[in-house]
Swiss-Prot record:
It comes from Prochlorococcus marinus (strain MIT 9301). This is Phosphomethylpyrimidine synthase. Catalyzes the synthesis of the hydroxymethylpyrimidine phosphate (HMP-P) moiety of thiamine from aminoimidazole ribotide (AIR) in a radical S-adenosyl-L-methionine (SAM)-dependent reaction. Belongs to the ThiC family. It catalyses: 5-amino-1-(5-phospho-beta-D-ribosyl)imidazole + S-adenosyl-L-methionine = 4-amino-2-methyl-5-(phosphooxymethyl)pyrimidine + CO + 5'-deoxyadenosine + formate + L-methionine + 3 H(+).
């Protein structure tokens, strides 16, 4: 779809959506997004120019259907997939991608760390994906030197970052905000550093006694990104891994640096979103969102959860969806899903489904709470179908139609029950919606009550 859009841009020094927006040009991607979001193209351009909205759209991802992440647009959901040294293969990851897209993932991150050829699995995912693909390049940087921190150089990081851009990756998690002076602040935490990318860079800095190379070479990374229109997803290496560690000095020190880096990327007209926690008590979620907006000049916020309790292994998709809904309500732009396998193992296809639906609920609830135009239309339509016992319409409007139909049919499988004016919960005699009271009857009752009140 995008080949004809991209062709005139080839060879230009800066092909980012932000660069076009700041020069007053509405790209085809901006126009496409405006139609999807039911917003004026001029508003999309203004928000991209301001940095409050991003359109992750690498010029080499030609089959991409552009989408937007920002407070002006709907709250989005990301799904993580990826092979590990102990499980998965390329075909399985492509199937996870297709499942994630089927159940509504707005973006997908390939977090493969081994077990397969990382370049091949990434290329296969990009070729099959209509949604933006994100990656974490430090994983492959370490894998490229066979896990040897002492052999890992600054140029190794930049080489892998550019390779991901060349393949068509739309956004990359760059852990540039973790500085060597932040590391002592981790002392006193229960779970230390829980970011894999952050852990790699912490080891690198401790081993070499040097500043984070992604920070010192940040301008070089910007130069790479603007050639391909790859978007920064600034990683939060010091995100809290438990409630005890939430909103501590380490997390907030890194957040301040992420704000500095956001503005540096904008000087290059490169798009940015900022990643956030993690594990956060409910009473601290609003503070975390507001603090990010303040420090990072309202760049889109992208949070993992957050989980609101630490005692829910096997059900972390529920614990985190609670926090995600709150974060979305307060202004977070994208929610990274958590599956039931979080903290326990590599998710399978069913885990991807469970996590995605939980997060689609959270994002949708946030859009309703923020009074986005049309956000509740589908809910109202389903409610009308429910009141009229239109079972097939109810299934169709559900976030997971297959699951809704499956649960209904467990007790009433025959087709005749798709027209029944009851379900197995109340049965035919006790459903309150079965005894419908007409508007005419209610008007008559109102008149009589008013008569009684007047004559009393």
């Amino acid at each position: 779809m995008r080949s004809s859009w991209i062709k005139p841009r080839l060879g230009k020094d800066n092909v980012t959506q932000m660069n076009f927006a700041r020069n007053g040009y509405i790209t085809e991607e901006m126009d496409f997004v405006a139609k999807k979001e039911n917003l004026p193209p001029s508003l999309i351009m203004e928000e991209v120019a301001r940095g409050r909205l991003i359109i992750p759209a690498n010029i080499n991802h030609l089959n991409l259907e552009p989408m937007s992440i920002g407070v002006a647009s709907r709250c989005k959901v990301n799904a993580n997939i990826g092979a590990s040294p102990n499980a998965s293969d390329i075909n399985e990851e492509v199937e996870k991608l297709k499942l994630a897209v089927k159940y509504g993932a707005d973006t997908v991150m390939d977090l493969s760390t081994g077990g397969v050829n990382l370049d091949e699995v990434r290329q296969a995912i990009i070729q099959e994906s209509p949604v933006p693909i994100g990656t974490v390049p430090v994983y492959q940087a370490l894998e490229s030197v066979h896990g040897s921190i002492d052999r890992l150089t600054e140029d190794d990081f930049l080489h892998i970052i550019e390779k991901h851009c060349q393949q068509g990756v739309d956004y990359q998690t760059i852990h540039a905000g973790l500085l060597i002076e932040h590391l002592p602040k981790v002392k006193g935490r229960i779970t230390g550093i829980v970011s894999r990318g952050g852990g790699i860079l912490a080891q690198w800095m401790l081993h070499h006694f040097k500043q984070n190379p992604l920070y010192t070479r940040f301008d070089d990374i910007c130069e790479i990104f603007k050639k391909y229109d790859c978007t920064f997803s600034l990683g939060d290496s010091l995100r809290p891994g438990c409630l005890h560690d939430a909103s501590d000095d380490a997390q907030l020190a890194e957040l301040k640096t992420l704000g500095e880096l956001t503005r540096r990327a904008w000087e290059h007209n490169v798009q940015v979103m900022v990643e956030g926690p993690g594990h956060v008590p409910m009473d601290q979620i609003e503070f975390n969102v507001r603090k990010q907006m303040e420090e990072c000049s309202e760049a889109p916020f992208y949070v993992l959860g957050p989980l609101v309790t630490d005692i829910s292994p096997g059900y972390d998709h529920i614990s985190s969806a609670i926090g995600a809904a709150m974060a979305g309500w307060y202004g977070t732009s994208m929610l990274c899903y958590v599956t039931p396998k979080e903290h326990l193992g590599l998710p399978n296809a069913e885990d991807v489904r469970e996590g995605l639906i939980a997060y689609k609920i959270a994002a949708h609830a946030a859009d309703i709470a923020r009074h986005r135009a049309g956000a509740r239309d589908r809910d109202d339509e389903l409610s009308h179908a429910r009141y009229n016992f239109d079972w097939n319409k109810q299934f169709e409007l559900s976030l997971d139609p297959e699951r809704a139909k499956q649960y209904h049919d467990e007790t009433l499988p025959e087709e005749i029950f798709k027209k029944a004016e009851f379900c197995s919960m109340c049965g035919p005699k006790h459903c309150p919606m079965n005894s419908k009271i007409s508007d005419e009857s209610l008007d008559q009752l109102k008149d009589k009550l008013e008569e009684c009140s007047t004559s009393a």
